[in-house]
Amino acid sequence: MPPMGQQAHVQVDGRGVLTIAIGTPKLVIDEYQDPICPPCAQFWADNGRDLSKAVADGKIALRLHSANFLDDKSASGDYSTRADASLLAVADLAGPNEVLRWQTALYSSVVQPEENAAVDHTSQQLGYLATYLDMPKEVSLAIAADTYRRGALDAAANTYDDLAKAGVVSVPATLVAARRVDTGRSNWLSELIGG
């Protein structure tokens, strides 16, 4: 992911929505995702670098909305919630560049568990991953302790409400001004940005 420099900021609001931006761009892209969802991983593989660059260039504010639709498809029964909590920990304790690095790691084929797999990752293993990625020690400890679990559960509940209001029933979902964007076209982001 392209580095964003010191001007970038990450903020988690009272609804658990994580916003990454430089300044206050007019274009705000809302991305809804679940850490076990294969299409979510494919979306990030296809678009993560371009979205990160658009943030780094100050062209968009990226708002990440965490879901846990697929908790029951994980071996532990709560992997999505714990992975969502880990993203909140990184946002709170590390910073915007680390958030996008962690996002990319969570949705990589190496890390993302398969639906209905016999095993997934424990919180301790996610903490070890943060250490491996050179995250600050307090991030690894918070992830291992599942410190942000309550925040992740609240964020997921708000995600359900937002998607229901928008008439969306699945993730990944990309919305701008509460309207779903067709991300099936290769130029969807450049069209939104205007070039």
Put a short name on every predicted segment.
Residues 127-195:
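C-terminal cap of thioredoxin/glutaredoxin-like
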Residues 24, 39-43, 74-82, 91-98, ...:
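Extracytoplasmic/periplasmic, Sec-exported soluble proteins
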Residues 41-118:
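Structural alpha/beta surface segment adjacent to cysteine/selenocysteine redox centers
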Residues 35, 84, 172:
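Residue-level detector of short, conserved catalytic/binding motifs and their immediate flanks
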